[in-house]
Amino acid sequence: PENYDLIYRGPIDLRHALAQSINVAAIKVLYLAGLQESLRTAKDLGIESLTNTNQYGLTLVLGGGEVSLLDLTSAYSTFANSGTRNPYVGILKIEDENGKVLEEFQPKSSVVLPENIALTISDILADEPARQPAFGVHSALYVDGRDVAVKTGTTNDYKDAWILGYTPSLAVG
């Protein structure tokens, strides 16, 4: 696999590899974590579209499986929420013309990651100095005065790019 900038960096620590979207390191981490266990974790995080788990390989971390932006944003919001997943919902409450509540969403949150793991991932994704070798100083991923965790990605052949970002109170993709 190639990195987006076509540069191979050799050994690199996980913080810098994740912050800079180093593809070779991502494949190694998936290999060490185990594909099936990683797919279970992805499902726990809210990624529902990876249904036929036997069709994926190590290139899954490079876009080898179709995942909707809504699923990705939902999964990253779990990191923002210290490891607790709150399923996304389109309608919170339905009221009649008099304000009487007819139906109301009842959240069913679940802890899917240890808090220290979620906080470490958030810290890495918000580490602007760790991103700098790949994205530059105060790149478009930097938000002055705010700790914003950000992850980028590209589609095959680099035709499209995406960005997910979050704070403890907001996740966008």
What is the predicted role of each segment?
Residues 16, 66-173:
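A penicillin-recognizing enzyme superfamily signal
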Residues 52-53, 166:
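Short, surface-exposed loop/turn microsegments at beta-strand edges and helix-strand junctions
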Residues 30-33, 40-45, 53-57, 87-92, ...:
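Short coil/turn segments at secondary-structure boundaries
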Residues 50-52, 112:
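Short helix-capping and inter-helix turn/linker motifs at the boundaries of alpha-helical repeat units
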Residues 2-47, 54-79, 124-127:
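Active-site-adjacent helix/loop patches that line small-molecule binding or acyl-intermediate pockets
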